[in-house]
Design a protein with these regions (language model features):
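Short acidic-glycine-tyrosine-enriched beta hairpin
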Residues: 176-188, 196-197, 327-351
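Short beta-strand/loop turn elements enriched in aromatics
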Residues: 141-163, 282-285, 300-313
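His/acidic/aromatic-lined binding-pocket segments of jelly-roll/cupin-type domains
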Residues: 106, 115, 137-140, 178-179, ...
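Ligand-binding loop in jelly-roll beta-barrel domains
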Residues: 101, 109-114, 123, 144-147, ...
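Short beta-strand segments in beta-sandwich/barrel cores
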Residues: 303-304, 320-326
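Double-stranded beta-helix
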Residues: 152-174, 203-242, 366-382, 409-422
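Histidine-centered metal-binding segments
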Residues: 240-277, 377-408
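Transition-metal
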Residues: 1-158, 219-250, 273, 293
Length: 422
């Protein structure tokens, strides 16, 4: 391919919608997405009358393969990008572990009505039974209606026989832990946790897997209760993160203490607090072996050095609008990728550094990457070096380890600077 030696760049993808009985129209109305579905040999443009339950922004799932929508690699799919550019996309450590499989999926969920109750397998079970990844997922609440509800696990320990009976007679809600979410809440859904939702728009960050099983469908659809029965955790649900309280290994959901954490000190521990950050810093939402996610309130430009992360980065715009700005290939001018509300952009690991500049007030982004599981240092959202410059760092001390790199260390000409919007 003629472009194999060209520098990669921030990439946006054509969103892939999924029509669902329980879906709504928020993707089209509130978030302004332009969505199409196959209709014979043609495509049909979706309207506000269509019920879009899911919308995949970044996915390498085989049956869903995101197509790049900008730049010189536009028109190619994410799997083609991976097969061509390998570790230049994901980073060397991620490539050594995942190969040409892109490791993370980003999608939106619009549950205007009640979703079916589901459960996800863990990685070991999924590998043994289905030769696939399991599914750990983060839900971030982008919008919540007056009747919003999340159904996460059980209110108290239940017996398998009671659960089975109530799934079959339609009264399973009596057993479930019900959370009344508000905009900005986040929840880590671990394998084995039964889950559903109603009246919310969610951003879901997950492993590259859609392997899940329907336990109860309020619309009378097919279920896989028997196949998934031994996957279910029948204990009471706890939203408390593992890293903050120390008794749930490897998982973090730093906002879980607002919704039923049983630890009295939760919210006072240094990991539960949004510690040392200001409106420009990355606030940890989740850290687990499969991915890491942070929320960024973007009031001022941020300069991010990708080499400190060692992996790709993904940004999803929940509110406002931003511009990702990189140096051109000759290093003498600025190239921009505008990120509007409801859009997602992938920054390949090869991109040395870039600026994120707000184009609107109250801009809020979700930043997704990979945890450096081989590094014992877990500062700044799970990374040894968080990648943000001094203004955006959320270390307790407010400073980074060491000095910022010189411009030419990252191949950026000293004359390149970001465009600031007034």
């Amino acid at each position: 391919m003629d472009n194999e030696n060209r520098m990669l760049y921030p990439m946006k993808f054509i969103p892939v919608p999924g029509l669902r009985d329980w879906g709504g129209n928020a993707m089209l109305t509130s978030f302004g997405k332009k969505l199409c579905v196959p209709d014979g040999r043609r495509e049909r443009v979706l309207t506000a009358d269509d019920r879009v339950g899911e919308c995949y922004d970044v996915a390498d799932l085989g049956y869903i393969d995101s197509m790049i929508d900008n730049g010189w690699f536009g028109g190619n799919t994410l799997s083609e990008l991976m097969n061509t550019y390998l570790e230049r996309v994901t980073g060397e450590r991620a490539f050594n572990w995942y190969g040409t499989q892109f490791p993370v999926t980003v999608k939106w969920i619009d549950a205007r009505d009640r979703m079916p109750l589901r459960v996800n397998p863990d990685d070991d079970t999924a590998a043994q039974r289905y030769d696939a990844f399991g599914k750990t997922a983060l839900w971030y609440v982008a919008e919540a209606g007056e009747d919003a509800a999340l159904y996460l696990g059980f209110a108290s320990e239940v017996s398998a026989s009671d659960f089975y009976a109530k799934c079959n007679d339609g009264s399973v809600d009596e057993l479930l832990n019900v959370v009344r979410p508000k905009k900005g809440d986040s929840f880590l859904i671990k394998p084995g946790t039964v889950y559903s939702a109603r009246g919310v728009v969610l951003v879901e960050i997950s492993e590259a897997s859609e392997l899940s099983f329907v336990l109860h469908d309020p619309y009378g659809g097919d279920t896989q209760l028997g196949e998934a029965f031994d996957l279910i955790d029948f204990g009471p649900f706890s939203a408390c993160c593992g890293e903050c309280c120390g008794d749930r290994d490897g998982d973090c959901c730093c906002h879980g203490h607002e919704h039923g954490c049983e630890h009295s000190h939760c919210g006072e521990h240094e990991h539960c607090q949004e510690r040392g950050h200001d409106d420009r810093s990355a606030v940890k939402l989740a850290v687990c072996p499969q991915f890491t996610a942070s929320g960024i309130r973007l009031d001022d430009p941020m300069h991010i050095y990708c080499e400190r992360f060692g992996s790709f980065l993904i940004y999803t715009c929940v509110e406002g609008e931003a511009s990702l700005q990189t140096a051109s290939e000759d290093g003498k001018r600025t190239e921009q990728c505008v990120l509007r509300r409801g859009e997602t952009v992938l920054v390949p690991a090869e991109v040395p550094d870039f600026f994120i500049v707000p184009r609107d007030k109250d801009t809020f982004l979700i930043e997704t990457g990979l945890s450096d599981v081989e590094d014992d240092s877990e500062e700044c959202c799970g990374h040894g070096d968080c990648g943000h410059d001094h203004e955006g760092c959320d270390h307790d001390c407010g400073e980074h380890f060491g000095d910022e790199p010189e411009d030419d260390d990252f191949g950026v000409d000293a004359g390149w600077s970001p465009h600031i919007y007034n």
